[in-house]
Amino acid sequence: MKGPITFLLQLGAVYTSIASACKLSDLPILSAHGSYGSNQCIAFGGEQAVIDRLIDPQACDIPKLIEATADQLQDGLTKGCFTSVDLVKVRITLQTPYRQGNVLIIVVVQTYVARIAEVNSTVRAVTEINPDALTIAKQMDNERKMGKLRGPLHGLPIVIKNNIFTDDKMSSTAGSYAIFGARTSADATVATKLREAGLVIMGKSGASQWANFRSLNSTNGWSAYGGQVTAAYIKNQDPSGSSSGSGVASDLGLAFATLGTETSGSIVSPADKSNIVGLKPTVGLTSRRFVVPISERQDTVGPMARSVKDAAYLLQVIAGKDSNDNYTSAIPFDTIPDYVKACDINALKGKRIGVPRNVIKIFGSPQTVVDQFNQALAVMKKAGAIIVENTDFTSFAEFAQSPIPDDILYADSLTNLPAFFKQLKVNPHNITDLESLRRFTQHHRLEEYPSRDTARWDIALQKGIKNTDPKFWPMYQKNVKFGNEGGILGALRRHKLDAAVLPTDLSPYIPALIGSPIITVPMGVYPNGTKVNHDRELVTSGPGIPIGIGFMGDLWSEEKLIGLAYAFEQKTHARPKLKRFIQPKKEVKGIL
């Protein structure tokens, strides 16, 4: 076969975007830096680890990984029930040279990697695993043995969205072959913070290509590089996006937790559809250095986890100022709040919670969602919250008809993407701006153009307004009004609210405009009899699909929102009640 064929070791599920057209013997093995040589053992842990156990693992109360929390995993690690190596060990050996045309891959997978291998050919949540994961896990185990713990997440495996660059053997592609093989001079700041806290970056998650900012006729969770991500509650379920794989991986217990990114809904919406907690931080609370951008005004990096407390643990790690991202200089506190301590079951008591009903009325929401939302309000009221009705976003009707929010993203992308491409120390296809990116995409067959168009880029280039253009500032001021006085901030001030709530699928739009935070928590499920709708092959609505509730707050109010979300979560325990059509069966006990 002519041309480079990228063969990804997708966690036991061996496939690429073109794998269906190729036999296994046709495919060379490539890393981000080139092909592996003959008879080479890929360093996922070829040697046997020597593990010192403090107690008999069979005597341990080891949690099921689909619901395991950071505290439970850390307790097992501390007691010696299992090690970080146990959580990530995998060996992949290339036995016969490719040039002889007979490649045999033997995969020995354990625990999280085994879980990924069980389901990834169906859900495609993870694009690759870190060849150095075992080495890092061993290091964390050795530090633990010597009495050194870097923090409460020491030794826990995490998967991060593939638009977050890492300076290691993994690829960072934003789902596109245009920057496959591109390198930055260092890890993204959030990745550095994860490593410093002792987390094992085990792999990268699939996502909507270019964070859903390429096409108007593509599907959520699709990318040329990773294929089509699907969620786990109904076959071919739309995972939403753009942090699609991060949502699915967290839900299925394919890692302790995941990182996603959001411009408008890209954390909370896939979290909603995968029945997990998603926390979109205030823009500037977490660094975006070496994260593929859309908009400097709206992009943010945040945690996606199975519980509010685990999301709080992860936010604690990644939050903070970074001289390489000037938006973080706006952080108003010298010390990052204790987000984990904010997890208080009584946090709803006495809090004023607003309900902007006009958003539901204007955008519309299925009656079953409204009914379950009203039941959630009743739970909060019973927990001591003061529910304040009709705290409307006064400019929402105008916002819903305005092209300005999209125009801001078009202008930012025309400026921010070239600035990012300029930072690449390796840029294999010489992608320098949106025009060259579009040209590559339209001429590379793996990018599936024109069946998946480039309409968003076409519009941005046609408009030609960058965020440095004099025309930009008046547009931006109007946009800010939609989110500020006419949106969430105005509602909070007028009604003296601690937070506002909406069904999650209605919550992202206004906070996106001003960079304010949201946290989504599982709330319920679409019942039997729900009409099944499709977008191409994906099921966008139907029985069994999760429903979440979004808590929206003031800038820098994550501490308060986490408390409210935690109290609601503990009063409802909605997540464990839902059934999936697919989930992995491998557990820690099975490999000890």
Swiss-Prot record:
MF terms (GO), sorted A to Z: hydrolase activity
Cystines in this chain: none
UniProt-listed Pfam families: Amidase
UniProt key word Hydrolase: yes
Gene Ontology CC annotation, any one: extracellular region
Positions with a binding annotation for substrate: S242, T263, S264, G265, S266
Enzyme class: hydrolase
Domain of life: Eukaryota
Subcellular location: Secreted
Residues annotated as the enzyme's active site: K161, S242, S266
Keyword Coiled coil recorded: no
Glycosylation site residues: N120, N217, N326, N430, N528
Alphabetically ordered keywords of this record: Glycoprotein, Hydrolase, Secreted, Signal
Signal peptide: 1-21
EC number: 3.5.1.-
Family membership: Belongs to the amidase family.
PANTHER family xref list: AMIDASE (PTHR42678), OS04G0183300 PROTEIN (PTHR42678:SF34)
Protein name: Putative amidase ARB_02965
